[in-house]
Amino acid sequence: NREDVYCEGIRQISKTDIEYAQKLGFVIKLLAIAEKIEGSSLSVRVHPTLVPSSHPLASVNGVNNAIFVEGEPLGQVMFFGPGAGAGATASAVSSDILNLVSQLISLPESNKQESKYKSKYTISCLDPLLASFHQENCQLAPREELVTRFYARFLTKDQPGVIGKLGTCFGECGVSLESVVQTGFQEKLAEIVVVTHDVTEGSFHKALDKIRNLEAIDSIPSLLRVL
């Protein structure tokens, strides 16, 4: 079901997060990700993501879109091109119309008449490269089982031991930290940015529940996943 696909927009992204991402060697991109995990489960999600500046997707800007594919034995391949704007949109629509027309022309005369009432005659003849078909349904994995890295920005009271308390909460939930950065203040509140190693989403949010109960924590204005 479409409702089972996790979707998150870019409204929470602030100038502060963009600046921290640059300092840490990342850019922020809105990605739609589908990946096979253990067994036959599929993880499908849409959300803003910190992408390493050296990654091919980091250089996709403006009206351009890209599809990045990784598999065996293919390795990594990226398809890149215009994905927005008048020209790109007109090209995509024209391609779909021409594909439909070409298939209607190639249908037997009897099927042409029936296709007016039964769209299956048209759909079954569509170019498989331009149509959307599947052989079997796939089980979507629960979001709690997703394994990824996380970026989190905390606003805390400026007092000793806050970073240590954060580390304790993360450690108790099995979350390993890759980096902890404290460089600025916002209205007398200290700003702490944390990037984790790979961790399940469930474990990460358990740690956040503990952290929210700390007296020194004012708020958690930003949470982002890291590619």
Where are these regions (language model features)?
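Substrate-binding/catalytic subdomain of NAD(P)-dependent oxidoreductase enzymes
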Residues: 1-59, 64-66, 85
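Short, surface-exposed loop/turn motifs that are enriched in glycine and acidic residues
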Residues: 7, 79-86, 156
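A generic structural motif
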Residues: 33-34, 70-72, 155
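Low-complexity, glycine/alanine/valine/leucine- and proline-rich hydrophobic stretches
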Residues: 44-72, 83-87, 168-171, 175-186
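An anion-binding loop in the catalytic cleft
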Residues: 69-80, 94
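Short, well-ordered beta-strand elements
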Residues: 77-82, 193-195
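Short, charged, low-complexity patches
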Residues: 86-94
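A conserved regulatory-domain signal marking ACT and ACT-like small-molecule sensing domains
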Residues: 97-227
